[in-house]
């Protein structure tokens, strides 16, 4: 039985986002304004998540900033560096880093993630992004930012090359025979010799596979190109959805596409990002919710709204007029997100102010007492709208409240583990170790010769 055929269990990841996802969260009285460059903060958050038996921690990234970027992105750690440090102080929790394909080389990415995979004992995950902010091109000496469709062609070739490099060494390649002097078996080392539309990579990679075979592939795809890429290549998908109905439709669509690519759809984990606010009783829930609401100003919400539209300046439009007609603006940045915003504004006849606050203020879906938040999580999971969630804390102590109050309820209901049962990120997520392509080919050849 493959791991994907075993009984379903809820999966949980923690987004560690320094001073917060939004523009105003750093102003909370208990917030640590330098959290995004504080190893102590990342250590504390990761230890909370591991103590609660989370599957992984997740570090987002961006390679372009400007004066109005959110505080976290203005001054923060590079993901692979901070995760390598966290690997040394953790034992079981997965470590997922965001790295772009549009401004990196496959050999570089393959080597970096393999190194993290070895340092952590097989707990690395790669969140594949194509980078939607056009200003990124200016930081890498590029004349222009690749168009949306081209970025996904780049992504497919890049990821295929990286996976090929990860298989450079068969699992038993290193003989370490001191008596004979054979350090490795030459026939078990393989050059990739890839030559494609965007990349030329000879290989082989100068580091072996880890105990989990290859790092786990994450991706966030909502556009048509993004959904197809995720369904074909990803092990787990990070997604933003507005409702359980939207989550169910997305999950069904992605798993249908995965099956079309010849994959077991149950091996694919759909993980919506949520921003839960938890209180011990109704009064504390309302108090904490209002704290979060008060951190979002209309001015900040207008700036935040521009991000999926390639940092478009919405400040030039009347706040209380209907949401402006934008044509195809956003189609070459975060297409799925910008299209969803435009469609929602049109369907509900919203003003610019209403749209901005709708997407910046915390939603009520996962706001409540521990039992109420657990109820919402259980409903989404059991209806098939998600296979788990990525927890993005709104308040400075949000992850602590969630791990100490909600996780025990989920455990009591048999939805979430009480102990780790494996050692790798693949173990945590119920994923099989991918076979080395060259070992598989050799086995097939041996069988054919035996039958000849």
Functional labels for PLM-detected ranges:
Residues 2-20, 149-212, 245-248, 252, ...:
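An alpha-helical appendage that flanks or caps ligand/catalytic pockets
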Residues 70-96, 259-261, 400-418:
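Alpha-helix-loop-beta-strand connector modules within alpha/beta enzyme cores
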Residues 89, 94-140, 146-149, 154-158:
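Hydrophobic or amphipathic alpha-helical targeting/insertion segments
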Residues 2-89, 212-215, 329, 423, ...:
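N-terminal beta1-alpha1-beta2 module of alpha/beta enzyme domains
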Residues 6-7, 47-51, 83-91, 117-123, ...:
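Acidic (Asp/Glu)-rich catalytic clusters
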Residues 10-14, 57-59, 93-99, 122-128, ...:
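Hydrophobic faces of well-ordered beta-strands that scaffold small-molecule active sites
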Residues 25-40, 98-108, 143-145, 149, ...:
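Active-site mouth loops of central-metabolism enzymes
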Residues 12, 49, 53, 86, ...:
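Conserved, mostly hydrophobic/aromatic
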């Amino acid at each position: 039985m493959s791991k994907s055929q075993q009984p379903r269990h809820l999966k949980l990841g923690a987004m560690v986002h320094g001073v917060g996802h939004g523009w105003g969260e750093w102003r909370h009285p208990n917030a640590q304004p330098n959290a995004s460059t504080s190893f102590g903060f990342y250590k504390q958050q990761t230890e909370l998540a591991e103590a609660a038996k989370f599957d992984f921690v997740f570090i987002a990234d961006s390679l372009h900033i400007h004066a109005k970027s959110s505080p976290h992105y203005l001054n923060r750690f590079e993901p692979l560096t901070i995760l390598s440090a966290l690997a040394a102080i953790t034992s079981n929790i997965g470590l997922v880093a965001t790295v772009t394909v549009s401004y990196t080389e496959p050999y570089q990415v393959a080597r970096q993630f393999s190194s993290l995979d070895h340092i952590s004992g097989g707990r690395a995950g790669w969140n594949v992004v194509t980078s939607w902010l056009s200003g990124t091109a200016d930081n890498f000496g590029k004349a222009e930012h690749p168009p949306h469709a081209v970025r996904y062609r780049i992504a497919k070739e890049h990821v295929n090359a990286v996976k090929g490099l990860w298989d450079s060494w068969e699992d038993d390649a290193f003989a370490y025979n001191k008596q004979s002097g054979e350090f490795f078996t030459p026939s078990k080392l393989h050059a990739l010799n890839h030559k494609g539309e965007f990349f030329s990579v000879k290989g082989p990679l100068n580091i072996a596979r880890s105990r989990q075979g290859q790092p786990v592939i994450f991706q966030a795809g909502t556009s048509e190109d993004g959904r197809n890429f995720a369904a074909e290549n990803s092990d787990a998908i990070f997604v933003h959805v507005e409702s359980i109905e939207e989550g169910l439709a997305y999950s069904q669509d992605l798993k249908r596409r995965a099956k079309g690519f010849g994959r077991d759809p149950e091996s694919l984990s759909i993980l919506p990002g949520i921003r839960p606010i938890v209180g011990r009783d109704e009064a504390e829930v309302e108090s904490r919710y209002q704290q979060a609401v008060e951190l979002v100003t209309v001015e900040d919400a207008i700036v935040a709204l521009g991000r999926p539209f390639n940092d478009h300046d919405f400040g030039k439009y009347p706040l209380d007029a209907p949401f402006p007609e934008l044509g195809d603006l956003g189609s070459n940045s975060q297409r799925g997100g910008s299209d969803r915003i435009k469609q929602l504004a049109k369907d509900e006849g919203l003003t610019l102010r209403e749209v901005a606050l709708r997407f910046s203020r915390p939603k009520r879906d996962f706001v409540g007492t521990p039992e109420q938040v657990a109820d919402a999580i259980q409903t989404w999971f059991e209806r098939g709208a998600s296979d788990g969630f990525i927890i993005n804390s709104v308040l400075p102590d949000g992850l602590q409240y969630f791990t100490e109050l909600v996780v025990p309820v989920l455990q009591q209901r048999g939805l979430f583990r009480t102990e780790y049962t494996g050692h790798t990120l693949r173990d945590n997520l119920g994923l099989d170790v991918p076979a080395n392509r060259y070992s598989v080919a050799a086995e097939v050849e041996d069988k054919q010769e035996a039958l000849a």
